[in-house]
Design a protein with these regions (language model features):
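Phosphate/nucleotide-binding beta-alpha loop and adjacent structural elements of enzyme active sites
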Residues: 1-310
Length: 310
C-alpha cells in the first residue's frame, strides 16, 4: 500500500499537480506557487506559501512549547504583540492557579459583558462563577453570555465600601467607572470627553458572600476585580472576610486614568497587608509613544492556603 501511495504521488506532477511530501504517509498537493515545510517538532509541521515567508519558531525553555512568529509583523507592532502575549500568559497562569489552589468559586467583579467568565470556561475552569456588573447595557450582554451555564450566576450590582446608590460614568465601553477621569486619562482616551451617568446599587462584598457561596462544601473562592480605579473600594467592602479568599486578581495602575484612584504601590501594599503575595504581573495597556505600562493585571495568592500535594 505504501508503495502504491508513493507511485500515485509520483504521477501527480505529470498532470500539473505538485506534491510536498511530509513523510509518514502524509503529503500536501497543490497546483500553483511554492510550498515549504518547516518541521516544528515530533508530529507537527508548518507548510508555508512562497519562498520568503518570515515565520520563525521559538522554543519556550524546556517545556516543549514553541512560539510561532511572523517576525516582520511582530517587529512592526511590538507593543501589540507584547500585550497580546501577556493576556494569553495571564489567562494560562490564572487557570493553573485555580487548579493548584482547588478554587471552586470565582467572583468576577466588574464583569462587563462576560469576557472573563467566557475565558475561564474556554480555558477549562468548571467551578462556579459569580459575576457582578452594575450598568444596564453591559449587564444585558453579561446575562446573555451566562445563559445555559447553570453554574454561572450574574448580579446587576456594583461592589464597594458601603451599601448605597451611586452614579457611575457610562458610555466609555469597557472603561465605565464610578470615578471621573484624571487629566492624564482625558489626554489618553478621547472617549472620556463625553459622558453620562447611571444610578446603580452598590453593596459590600462581605454582605454578599453567604449568598454567593451557598451550596458549596468547603468554599475556596478567588476574587477577580477590574473596576476601573475602584478595586481598593471593592476590597475594603470584603472586610474581615477577605481572609476567606485563597487568591485574587486586581488591575493596578502605574499611571492614574481616574481621579482619586490608587497608584500601583498603594494598592499592592494593602493586598499584601491582608496576606496576599504576587505570583504574576501582566501588562494590560502601554503608552505607544513611550512604552510605559499604564496598567497591570496583578495576580496574587494566599500562600498558606495552598493544598498539600498528595
Amino acid at each position: 500500500m505504501a508503495t502504491l501511495h508513493r507511485k500515485l504521488l509520483g504521477l501527480l506532477p505529470r498532470v500539473g499537480v505538485q506534491v510536498l511530501d511530509l513523510g509518514s504517509g502524509a503529503a500536501v498537493v497543490y497546483r500553483r506557487g511554492v510550498r515549504r515545510r518547516v518541521a516544528l517538532g515530533k508530529g507537527a509541521d508548518l507548510v508555508l506559501r512562497g519562498r520568503t515567508a518570515a515565520w520563525k519558531q521559538v522554543p519556550l525553555g524546556g517545556t516543549g512549547a514553541r512560539l510561532l512568529l511572523d517576525e516582520k509583523e511582530t517587529a512592526a507592532d511590538e507593543r501589540t504583540f507584547q500585550l497580546s502575549a501577556a493576556s494569553y500568559l495571564c489567562g494560562q497562569h490564572v487557570t493553573a492557579l485555580l487548579d493548584r489552589y482547588e478554587v471552586n468559586c470565582v467572583l468576577d467583579v466588574g464583569a462587563n459583558s462576560g469576557q472573563y467568565g467566557r475565558q475561564l470556561r474556554r480555558l477549562g475552569y468548571t467551578g462556579r462563577i459569580v459575576s457582578f456588573e452594575p450598568t444596564a447595557e453591559a449587564f444585558a450582554k453579561l446575562r446573555q453570555a451566562a445563559e445555559g451555564d447553570p453554574d454561572w450566576q450574574v448580579h446587576q450590582i456594583g461592589l464597594g465600601r458601603e451599601d448605597t446608590t451611586q452614579s457611575i460614568h457610562v458610555g466609555w465601553n469597557t472603561m465605565n467607572s464610578l470615578l471621573p477621569p484624571s487629566d492624564y486619562g482625558k489626554g489618553r482616551y478621547k472617549r472620556f470627553a463625553k459622558t453620562r451617568t447611571e444610578e446603580i446599587e452598590v453593596r459590600r462584598l462581605d454582605g454578599m458572600l453567604d449568598t454567593v457561596l451557598a451550596g458549596i462544601d468547603a468554599p475556596r473562592p478567588y476574587l477577580k476585580m477590574d473596576t476601573q480605579g475602584y478595586d481598593l473600594e471593592v476590597f475594603a467592602g470584603a472586610g474581615e472576610r477577605a481572609a476567606e479568599f485563597v487568591g485574587m486578581q486586581s488591575e493596578v495602575a502605574t499611571l492614574r486614568l481616574y481621579e482619586g484612584s490608587p497608584r500601583m504601590g498603594e494598592a499592592i501594599a494593602v493586598y499584601e497587608e491582608r496576606g496576599f503575595e504576587i505570583t504574576g504581573m501582566y501588562p494590560v495597556s502601554r503608552e505607544e509613544a513611550t512604552g510605559r505600562v499604564v496598567e497591570f493585571d496583578c495576580v496574587m495568592v494566599r500562600a498558606t492556603a495552598v493544598p498539600a500535594r498528595t
